[in-house]
Amino acid sequence: MNSLIKENMRMMVVMEGSVNGYQFKCTGEGDGNPYMGTQTMRIKVVEGGPLPFAFDILATSFMYGSKTFIKHTKGIPDFFKQSFPEGFTWERVTRYEDGGVFTVMQDTSLEDGCLVYHAKVTGVNFPSNGAVMQKKTKGWEPNTEMLYPADGGLRGYSQMALNVDGGGYLSCSFETTYRSKKTVENFKMPGFHFVDHRLERLEESDKEMFVVQHEHAVAKFCDLPSKLGRL
């Protein structure tokens, strides 16, 4: 347990960027229990609102990127909590099946006992008649991220699905590289493992100008038994 990371932690976030050339800025604040893997965040669009695209494509960059709030089961070293007080960064490319591409660069730091996130995002090639630009998405299904050590950090892959108005899904693939600001020689790296995520929107108002969302995340090994004794 990292003494700098308490059982209840506050967080603040600033996100700015563009989607299909449209500029915007969001801020958020929240709290949660990093050791239970639960967190709640309240997010406001402070520039460029109401957004002309679905807020859902931003949602994963607020909390699916809030990696300090993951419960790690026994035997899995916590790459993210070990990274403090220096913190960590991550870069992600999300490719949607309709051709849209969403990239994120995020920095996580610890300031006066509060987790502070700065995110730069860029979305391109989202079809004007697609679910994202028509604002016809209805939230993310739960998913599992696969993680393993790579290039001195962690590499994450996952397939995700957005619910769409009228039934059906818009699927996408996530590829994320996580890097600690601390040299990896100073802490224990985890091996191959998974993280289950459930990201839910609890509240929204004013045409998605204000959103409250909650996430529960747990790191684990495969639940299936191995004949070779592997985890």
UniProtKB/Swiss-Prot annotation:
Pfam families recorded: GFP (PF01353)
Covalent link (2-iminomethyl-5-imidazolinone (Met-Gly)) residue numbers: M63-G65
Keyword Ligase: no
Keywords: Chromophore, Luminescence, Photoprotein
InterPro entries membership: GFP, GFP-related
Record note on biotechnological use: Fluorescent proteins have become a useful and ubiquitous tool for making chimeric proteins, where they function as a fluorescent protein tag. Typically they tolerate N- and C-terminal fusion to a broad variety of proteins. They have been expressed in most known cell types and are used as a noninvasive fluorescent marker in living cells and organisms. They enable a wide range of applications where they have functioned as a cell lineage tracer, reporter of gene expression, or as a measure of protein-protein interactions.
Keyword Transferase: no
Post-translational modification: Contains a chromophore consisting of modified amino acid residues. The chromophore is formed by autocatalytic backbone condensation between Xaa-N and Gly-(N+2), oxidation of Tyr-(N+1) to didehydrotyrosine, and formation of a double bond to the alpha-amino nitrogen of residue Xaa-N. Maturation of the chromophore requires nothing other than molecular oxygen.
Any GO BP annotation: bioluminescence
Modified residues ((E)-2,3-didehydrotyrosine): Y64
Assembly mode: Monomer.
Function per UniProt: Pigment protein.
Name this protein carries in UniProt: Red fluorescent protein eqFP611
Biological source species: Entacmaea quadricolor
